Amino acid sequence: SKGNMAVLNMLNTKYFITPKGQAQQNPGAMGNAWFVDTINIVPNADAEIAGLNEFNPATTAIVDARFSKQIIDSLDNTAANIVLIVYKPNYLQYNSSSTNDGIAIFSEIYYSKGWNAYVDNKLTPHFRANYVLRGMQVPAGNHTIEFKFEPPSYFTSEIVAYVSSIILLLLLGFVSYTEFR
């Protein structure tokens, strides 16, 4: 393949279509989430993209310096695991188990607006890693990790829709009452 296999693997690309139209399984696909041992902080997004050319996504994450306040020194987490339990368009749930605090990388596109991360129902910051993915500091132990799409605009429009429905029902009731009276 002429593509960057490390990037395809971190994006959890499970299959390739060959020039003959055959599906070929990618044995290097990273899965939905994993822990890394090394964090490479780079000065900007350009350096983050450049770093994707020569790195091992199984062990290393490349992070823009803007997100460095959310990063701990990652520890050896070779025995750690993280498993996707629930996958919906606006909700993701993972179970993690690790003996040390660590950094988990999620093979989900990072989008800061509206997405909130929770560890054991506690709002937890997450950051962009490897230019396009999500990363998060995960404490040692067994935890439930959730990503929820909770944009304020959605809740505002939901309230407006409910209030509008109530007003419409009251108006219809009033019109019906005055017509049949």
Q: Which residues fall in each region the model found?
A:
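Extracytoplasmic
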Residues: 1-77, 99, 122
